[in-house]
């Protein structure tokens, strides 16, 4: 096993750990989930570049008769990238004392100001950071409003 294979295993393990945390552990942290809302995905250009580069590496490894283990590891990395970038849906998860946004826990008392833009983006101003929440379904903004009113 080469150092390349070890690095690939490390990246696959990191992506798998992130996917498991995002899918199974985060919704169970900090109490029961009151509301979980699907968000719009960010630009997919980065994901296309990542999966494309891994596909080029797979092609290069196959045509140069590289190690079969490396080809399988690259394929697993491409599948993990495909899952994380295209299948997994970003979510905002509301709990009793706060919410998870982009895998970061934010307590309700940190919200200083909230605005709704004309194009349906909820803007939350924290102490030093601004959150831009783009929901997939515009009707979910009313659900978010009700949760925030009930818990503040």
Curated annotation (Swiss-Prot):
Recorded GO CC terms: plasma membrane
Superkingdom: Bacteria
Compartments reported by the entry: Cell inner membrane
Membrane spanning stretches: 6-26, 45-65, 67-87
Keywords: Cell inner membrane, Cell membrane, Membrane, Transmembrane, Transmembrane helix
Membrane topology field: Multi-pass membrane protein
Sequence similarity: Belongs to the UPF0266 family.
Protein name in the entry: UPF0266 membrane protein YobD
Gene assigned in the entry: yobD
